Regions:
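Glycine/serine-rich phosphate-binding loop and adjoining beta1-alpha1 elements at the start
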Residues: 1-26, 57-192
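Short hydrophobic beta-strand segments
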Residues: 28-33, 157, 194-197
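Active-site cofactor/substrate anionic-group-binding motifs, chiefly glycine-
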Residues: 30-32, 45-64
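Short His-Asn-centered micro-motif
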Residues: 33-35, 108-109
């Protein structure tokens, strides 16, 4: 199973899970997640559950859900509202279903769930004590809400963490962007002129990977 493959290659989460099984730091918490439903996220969900939390989950992208992983998580007893190829209506229906169990914590990627809690589903906001947001785009949305005085609970900007910049943004985004280009085009990158617009941590990673494959960047 793909989850086994991911679990074997995520030693930090494995160590945290082992510790959490004894300490239960999230006992009594109800976590609503809106992240990509992939084999890696499945390992995160297992870890959060091991820490004592109840879980309800939806996908943050209509096209990123790995259906076999979603089915496996559901079979394991987790509340999963996600499938590949959702319409816009499906996407928000799944977020709404995720919120129905009245979370105390939210985990978001793009801020769609958090914005929903502050808008159409504001009846759930009072029960939330905090959340996280992973992406630059989502953080911008939430900072605008905070500046306007509209943010109803504290949110940790995961994207501001140095480990996020220097590992995920540089190496993760760099590799996955090149992987996406290769899957879409099957083009040989060596010898090509490769233009990167923007030179933050993500752009730096893309430029490094392209240069490493022989492109003129």
């Amino acid at each position: 199973l793909r989850v086994d493959w991911a679990r074997a290659r995520m030693p930090v989460l494995a160590a945290l899970k082992e510790e959490a099984l004894n300490t239960k730091p999230l006992a009594g918490m109800k976590v609503a997640g809106c992240l990509h439903v992939t084999k890696e996220t499945a390992v995160l969900i297992e870890t959060i559950a091991a820490a004592g939390a109840e879980i309800s989950w939806s996908g943050c992208n209509p096209l990123s859900t790995q259906d076999d992983v979603a089915a496996w998580l559901a079979a394991e007893g987790y509340s999963i509202h996600a499938w590949h190829g959702q319409s816009v209506e499906d996407f928000y229906w799944c977020i709404d279903k995720t919120l129905e169990f009245k979370p105390t914590l939210t985990l978001d990627d793009g801020a769609d769930l958090i914005v929903r809690v502050h808008g159409e589903k504001s009846e759930y906001a009072d029960g939330v004590i905090g959340g996280t947001e992973e992406t630059t785009t989502g953080v911008h949305r939430l900072r605008a809400m905070g500046k306007a005085g509209d943010l109803k609970y504290p949110v940790i900007a995961v994207n501001d963490a140095i480990t996020k910049w220097d590992f995920d943004n540089v190496y993760g985004t760099g590799q996955s962007t090149i992987d996406g280009i290769l899957r879409a085009t099957s083009v040989l990158i060596a010898g090509k002129t490769f233009v990167v617009a923007g030179y933050g941590h993500c752009g730096k990673g893309v430029a490094m990977r392209a240069q490493g494959m022989g492109a003129n960047v």
